[in-house]
Amino acid sequence: MKKVESFELDHTKVKAPFIRKCCVYEGGHGDKISKFDIRFLQPNKEAFGTAAMHALEHHLAYNIRENLDGVIDISPMGCRTGFYLSTWGDKDPIEIKAAVETVLRNLLKSEDIPASNEVQCGNYKDISLFGAKGYAKDVISKGFSLNIYGE
């Protein structure tokens, strides 16, 4: 049975917040896709409220593309402690950190949530800009580490 990369991570040893380059996949034609773990909250100790996480997802999805080339997708983790980011190419975590922090600083100045309406979102009523700003402010003050063990 093939292993799931994220399940191989010892969640008891990591120190959030951090940005981790999980892997680089190489396709049959030499194309590369990088996958990143953007961890806001300490695993098994904290979890996003769904409305705040939903607003963070909308802001990240909408605005990360303005700050980073080659974005394929950014998706919330099922455990509600962070997001996965997939990009074309072999990206450097420093570049990812800069882009994510820029989006979060801009979120703090935002007065609305992109695509938070019935047409563009499947659960637009469960979304909180106030909650998203709280998480953004907290992670900006702590800073994302590029060392998952906090050293």
Show which residues each predicted segment covers.
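His/Glu-rich zincin catalytic helix
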Residues: 1-52, 56-64
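Extended aliphatic helical segments
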Residues: 4, 14, 24, 71, ...
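Proteins with a high burden of low-complexity, intrinsically disordered sequence enriched in S/T/G/P/A and R
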Residues: 4-6, 14-17, 79-81, 95, ...
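Intrinsically disordered, low-complexity regions enriched in small/polar residues
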Residues: 9, 20, 27, 85-86, ...
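Generic recognition of cysteine residues
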Residues: 22-23, 79, 121
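Short, flexible coil/linker segments at or flanking structured domains
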Residues: 26, 41, 71-73, 128
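M16/MPP (pitrilysin/insulinase) zinc-metallopeptidase core fold and M16-derived inactive scaffolds
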Residues: 45-96
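Acidic/histidine-enriched segments that form metal/cofactor-coordinating
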Residues: 86-151
